[in-house]
Structure formats: structure tokens, C-alpha cells
Amino acid sequence: MASAAVGNYEEEIVRPVADFSPSLWGDQFLSFSIENQVAEKYAQEIEALKEQTRSMLLENGRKLADTLYLIDIIERLGISYHFEKEIDDILDQIYNQNSNCNDLCTSALQFRLLRQHGFNISPEIFSKFQDENGKFKESLASDFLGLLNLYEASHVRTHADDILEEALAFSTIHLESAAPHLKSPLREQVTHALEQCLHKGVPRVETRFFISSIYEKEQSKNDVLLRFAKLDFNLLQILHKQELAEVSRWWKDLDFVTTLPYARDRVVECYFWALGVYFEPQYSQARVILVKTISMISIVDDTFDAYGTIKELETYTDAIQRWDINEIDRLPDYMKISYKAILDLYKDYEKELSSAGRSHIVCHAIERMKEVVKNYNVESTWFIEGYMPPVSEYLSNALATTTYYYLATTSYLGMKSATEQDFEWLSKNPKILEASVIICRVIDDTATYEVEKSRGQIATGIECCMRDYGVSTKEAMAKFQGMAEAAWKDLNEGFLRPTPVSTEILFRILNLARIVEVTYIHNLDGYTHPEKVLKPHINALLVDSIEI
């Protein structure tokens, strides 16, 4: 209960305070001292290893299976960003040659790699492994590596790939049965894949796991690739720690923990989110811009969800639409803090991008933010007034409140390659973006349903679905899961060439969907309660280096 003075009277204001847990990290990431000699040594050795790896990739006369395996290992080890053109050229050649393999393992690997790189290879590549009834042959049940690759390939399916629905069911049931009896490290790889498939995983998280838990234990490992991957991971981690220290200092200076104690203090988790969108060194500026934006919109989200009154939120919404510092006097004191911080942040972005002649693109992110706040206000009004909208009305508003239209747009601000045409394309909410947003919405809604219900929130997606369709909670959640699966098919389809924008642009949209899958795994809200889900990932990526 909070009180506010109105005229000569004091009015009691009941606020829906959520009582979020404090940060897990304290000042742990506030400072970071770099050992320049170590970093320089890593960088020098990496250059030599890079050339050795390039020679491996460009080697002539290798079998198709060996080429595909090499590309897969390089990608899983997190070093493929050094060889994007070489890998694309090789896969282009394989696609155009229409090469076919007779074994399940190679066929599935070929299908997945080509699809992930935008080549529309036909799923008919798998028909040779089916019987006359269209079922996968039971003789494949003992080909565990083949089944694992088939399972991973099934997750890049589109709406036209019915055969891959069967592939997913077939591979899953046999892998689940076999997993406890497999030898290490295949056992660990299969167990991990069944919990988190590669295609929907956060690239850095998957790389860390693969280096330490799988490839290092492989008898057939390539020592050059393994050392390259370890050094590259540790060198990038130094950069990531520097960025996190910079962002942590910025966050501490804002002092929202003291001035806005009702909001979640999650700047480290926000950095993990940005790291999931892009980990490569050339995106350093983009990452810092994105993490600051996520941290700031999280404060705004909690203001609407967990503190503001209808009148305050309407005034705040109007002030954001006007985007003028003179509006600040209309706001209650606590809202002035975030309002000024937001306007200052975007001025900083404009100043930072002006040296590259890109300050004009910031307006795209501002417009998206205005949209989010407007939709937050609708959502809060529903909550406070006890209104439960039809599912269609709920979704038309709730897709914007995922913040994913906004974050996708913001993710391009620091990308030097992002053009005005890319921003215009994104502003039309293309199908691939809609898919990523839907994935975020339905996974978030499913994971947070019980908590929101306990707080008296009736206008949730699950509740609206239950009422509209006359179904149980379990059935409503299954419907939402079906929406997520359909959206993943749309997203995968959006990657197939020809595409209206570059793959580099599309990858941000894909990676945003991946982060949601990981953050809300097992229907846990890993952002609000990071101790179970995100803490191990953050430790693996930002605390513990890999032993060389």
C-alpha cells in the first residue's frame, strides 16, 4: 500500500507490487581487468589456427560426408563466423550438385546444414529411409548417430515438410529409449539434444556445452579445431566481460535499484539476452545498445505491470508518445526518473551513431517503443478493470507487448550493415518477424500463467483461450504450443532463399526466438527467476573461462 497526497487530503493508492527477488550478481561484473598479454597471445595463435582451418575447409577431393561433418563441427565449436563465405560457397556447390548420400547420418546432416543456410533442399532426401507405408524403417533404430542427426534435422522443418513430422516422432522415441545405454560422449549429446535441440538453442550456450562436454571427449577430435575453439571462446569472453562491465557501470550510475525498487534488477540477464542475439566481435556496439534497451524496457514493463495506477500510466503513455522532455513535469516523481533516462538514452544513441552518419535510424526504434508503451497501457487497463478480451483482441495487443518488434528493430541500430531499406522492410512486420514475436508471446504466456493467475491477472492468453474455446488449462497450453510450432515453421520458411534481406539481418530475428526457448525452458520464467535457468548459462559464458 502506498499513499499519495491529493490537495489537502491523503489518498491511499493500492499498487500491484510484485515483490521481485534482487539481482543474483551484486557488483560482481562491475569491474573487469584485462590481461593484455594473454589476449594478444590468444589473438596471435588464433590467426595461425584460422589459416590451418581454412586450408582444411578448402581441401579438394574430400568425401561429401567428411565435408559436411567438418562444417558441422566448425559451426558447433563456434568458430564458423571466421569462414562464412567459404562455408556458404561449399554448401552452394553441394546444393547445386544435388549430391545424395545413402546413409541416414549424412543425409540428415546435409539437409539440416543446407536448410539452416537458406538452401531449399527437398525433404524427399529422406524417402529412401521409409517403408511402403511411409514409416521410417525400424532397421534404423540402432543407428543412433543417424537418429540424432535426423532428430536435429526435423527442427528446421516448414509447413510443407510432413515427412519431418514423422522423422521427429520416430527419432525422439528411439533416442529416448536408447539414451541411458549409450556410451559417452554420445549419451550426453543425445540427452542434451532431447532437452534442447540445436536449431532452437542459443549459439553461445550450445558452443560452450559442445566444446567442454562433447568434443573434448571425442576420440576422433581434431586438436587444431579444439584448440582454436577454446582460444576463440576465451578471447571473445574477454570482450564480453568488458562490455558487461561497461553496461553494469551505466546501470549502477542510473541507480534504479534505489529509486525504482519495485522493478526487476536484471541487467546481467539482459546482457545474456543481447549476447544471444549476436556474440561475434563486430557486433560489440550493437550488443551494448541492445542490452541497455532491454534493461530500460524491463523497467517500463514493471512500471505498468507492478506499480503504476491507471491515471499515472495514461499520463506516462501520453508523455512517451509526445517524446518531449518538457512533458516530464506532468509525471509523478518516480516516473520522471525513467522518462528522463529513456530520452537521455536515445540522445546518446543518436550521438554515438552520428559519427557513422547513422543517427537518423534511431527514429525507427523510438517509434517501436511508443507502440510498446501504448500496448502496455491497454494491457494494464484490462488488468485493473478486470476485462478479459477475446483471444484475437488479446493477441493483437499482446504481440506488441512481447517487445520483440521493438527489440528486433533496436538490434539493427549498431549493425553497420543494416540499411534504411532493412528498417523499412522490418517496419512492415514481415512474416518471419511475426513468427518470432508469436513464439515469444505464447512461450512467455505458458511459462508465466500460474504466477500471473496468482496475482489476479485474468486477461492472460491462457485464460482468454480457455474461455473462448471452452477448454481446460492443459488444452489451452497445448493450443499455444501448437501456435509456437507453427510459428517455428514460418520462421524456418523465412530463411529459404531468395530472401528480401540478407541472412545477417534474418539471424537476429531467429536468435531472438532462440533466446525465448532457452529462457522459458520447462515452463520456467528464467528472466524473473534466473537462479535455475539462466544462472548456469551466465556462469558458463561470462564467469568461467575454458581451460586450455
Swiss-Prot record:
- This protein is called 5-epi-aristolochene synthase 3
The written remark on domains in the entry is:
The Asp-Asp-Xaa-Xaa-Asp/Glu (DDXXD/E) motif is important for the catalytic activity, presumably through binding to Mg(2+).
Q: Tell me the GO BP annotations in alphabetical order.
A: defense response; diterpenoid biosynthetic process
An example of a Gene Ontology cellular component annotation for this protein is:
cytoplasm
The Swiss-Prot or TrEMBL record lists the needed cofactor(s) as: Mg(2+)
Provide this UniProt record's keywords sorted from A to Z.
Cytoplasm, Lyase, Magnesium, Metal-binding, Plant defense
* Chain residues that bind Mg(2+) 2: 301, 305
Q: Which family does it belong to?
A: Belongs to the terpene synthase family.
Q: In which tissues is it expressed?
A: Expressed in roots, but not in shoots.
> Which EC number(s) are documented for this chain?
4.2.3.61
Q: What class of enzyme is it?
A: lyase
Q: How does it assemble?
A: Monomer.
Q: Which residues bind Mg(2+) 3?
A: 444, 448, 452
Q: How is the cofactor bound?
A: Binds 3 Mg(2+) ions per subunit.
Which reactions fall under this protein's catalytic activity? (2E,6E)-farnesyl diphosphate = (+)-5-epi-aristolochene + diphosphate
Does the UniProt entry include the keyword Metal-binding? yes
